[in-house]
Amino acid sequence: MAAMTVQLDIVSAESRIYSGLVAHLQVTGSEGDLGVMPGHAPLLTHIKPGMARIVKQDGSEEVFYLSGGILEVQPFSVSVLADVVLRADEIDEQAAVEAKRRAETALADAGADFNYAAAAIELAQAIAQLRVVETIKKNIAR
């Protein structure tokens, strides 16, 4: 008996990052973590900056960083559209740490003309990238 799978396409503003059959997708939706498996009900939702974890047809896993975007689930296909998509090994950990530090400093020293939304987005994206890096480190240590 063949494993149940669904076609997944992960697309950034620049290119298609992943296209293939998967058994499971996990992303951070606007209302919390969301798991998508074959047969999932149709859905269209926003996704927050965070990790996308896929379990491929052969059981192997791959992890991506998404800057946020849109998730569309159809009966036989799933599409993830994001401005920025990085494979876990493409994330610059030091740059993410520095971006997190900058955003935290900006939030702490906010003035009257401060753009809170931009700083909060930068902080969320940096934290999400660091979580992806940490997840990969934990999986390698196993």
UniProtKB/Swiss-Prot annotation:
Disulfide bonds: none annotated. Keywords: ATP synthesis, Cell inner membrane, Cell membrane, CF(1), Hydrogen ion transport, Ion transport, Membrane, Transport. GO terms for cellular component: plasma membrane; proton-transporting ATP synthase complex. InterPro entries: ATP_F1_dsu/esu_C_sf (IPR036794), ATP_synth_F1_dsu/esu (IPR001469), ATP_synth_F1_dsu/esu_N (IPR020546), ATP_synth_F1_esu_C (IPR020547), ATPsynth_dsu/esu_N (IPR036771). It is a peripheral membrane protein. GO terms for molecular function: ATP binding; proton-transporting ATP synthase activity, rotational mechanism. The keyword Magnesium does not apply. Its main location: membrane. Transmembrane segments: none annotated. It is found in: Cell inner membrane. F-type ATPases have 2 components, CF(1) - the catalytic core - and CF(0) - the membrane proton channel. CF(1) has five subunits: alpha(3), beta(3), gamma(1), delta(1), epsilon(1). CF(0) has three main subunits: a, b and c. Produces ATP from ADP in the presence of a proton gradient across the membrane. NCBIfam families: ATP_synt_epsi, PRK00571.1-4. This is ATP synthase epsilon chain. The gene is atpC.
